[in-house]
Amino acid sequence: MLQQDSSVCLFWHGTHRSAQTIFRSETEVNSPIRSADEYIASLRGRKLRVFLFGELVDEPVDHPLIRPSINAVAETYALALRNPELGTAVSPYTGERINRFLHVAGSAQDLVLQNKMQRRLGQLTGTCFQRCVGMDAINALHSVTFDIDAAHGTGYHRRFIDFVTQMQRAGFVIGGAMTDAKGDRSKAPHEQADPDVFVHVSRRTDEGVYIRGAKAHQTGCINSH
C-alpha cells in the first residue's frame, strides 16, 4: 500500500473543493467545447496569475511565447472534428461522442486508437500537445480508485466517475501535477538541501510505503481548464 506521510500534504483540499464547484457551474450552464476556436475562446478572461521570466502575463492567450502551445492543444479539438473515428470515442458515462483525450479506455482497440491519435497529432503539431498527462491520469485513476474502494469500502471511484463525466460534458482539458519541484537543478535529488523538492520514499513499515515531497503542475496547465 502506498501512503502519504502525514507531515507533507500532496493535495490541497480547499483548492479542490473550489475547482469542483467551478466545474459543476461551468458544465451545467455552458455547451461542450468542440472546436479549436471554442477552446481558445474558453481560455480568455480566467484571471490567472501567470508569471513568465518574472513578469505578470495579462492574458496568456495573447502572449507570443504561450500562444503556440495553445495552438497545439487546439489541434486536439480540430482533429476530433476532422476525424471523429480517431479523435473521439463514445463515453460509457454520457452515451455521447467525446474527445478521446477524455475517454477511459475500455478495450485494447481503445488503446490502439489512442496511440494512433497521439502519433497523428505529433505529425500535425511537431510539438507537445499537452493533453497526454490528463488522459493518462484519468485512465490510471479509474483503476486505482476502484481497487482502493474494493479494499477499504471508500467512495473514491464514484466521485472520480462524477468528475470525469463533468469534464466530458464540458469538453474540458485536464492538466496534471506530475513535475517535481526540482530545487537546485545542478544537483541530483539525493543532494538537495530540502529533500522534499522531489517526491521520495520517507519510510517503510509493515503497513506499506510512505511518501513525502512536492509535485508541481506542468506548464500546460496554463492551457487547461
PLM feature spans:
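N-terminal-proximal low-complexity accessory segments that begin disordered
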Residues: 30-76
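Internal helix-loop-helix
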Residues: 78-174
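Beta-sandwich/jelly-roll carbohydrate-recognition scaffolds of carbohydrate-active enzymes
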Residues: 162-164, 187-200
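A short, Trp-centered hydrophobic/proline-enriched beta-strand micro-motif
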Residues: 171-184
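A short core secondary-structure module
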Residues: 214, 218-225
